[in-house]
């Protein structure tokens, strides 16, 4: 496999499993997919962070709020790899419980990844809510 195929294999297995775990209340796998080396930035749909420690705190807060994920779909729009950097543009369609209340939402996401010691790590994430169809006309 080439770099892009190797990266997409990681994205579709390790990274996706970490997202499902987070939406079931377990931030541990997400910690493992994120860089602990500066710079790290998170412009989340609900919370933001500007360094690895703050990002970890955000993930702990999210995991405390999430439970009982019933659906998790990722629709990849674009992805590429150049050396030790990669990016994805995708939509995350999620059904989970937030503070005990069922919730469905779609996020538009752009992520940048760094290869660190041979492993891919998220270094930047920007996510926002998908506008309603009427808002996009």
Model-found features: residue ranges?
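Short beta-strand edge/turn micro-motifs at domain boundaries
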Residues: 104-136
């Amino acid at each position: 496999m080439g770099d892009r195929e190797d990266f997409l294999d990681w994205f579709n297995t390790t990274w996706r499993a970490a997202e499902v775990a987070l939406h079931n209340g377990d931030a541990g796998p997400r910690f493992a997919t994120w860089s602990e080396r500066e710079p790290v930035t998170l412009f989340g749909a609900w919370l933001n962070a500007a360094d690895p420690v703050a990002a970890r705190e955000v993930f702990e807060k999210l995991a405390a709020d999430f439970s009982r994920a019933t659906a998790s779909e990722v629709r990849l729009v674009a992805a590429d790899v150049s050396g030790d950097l990669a990016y994805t543009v995708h939509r995350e369609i999620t059904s989970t419980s937030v503070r005990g209340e069922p919730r469905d939402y779609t996020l538009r996401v752009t992520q940048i990844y760094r290869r660190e010691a041979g492993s891919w790590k998220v270094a930047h994430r920007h996510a926002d809510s998908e506008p309603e169809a009427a808002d996009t006309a």
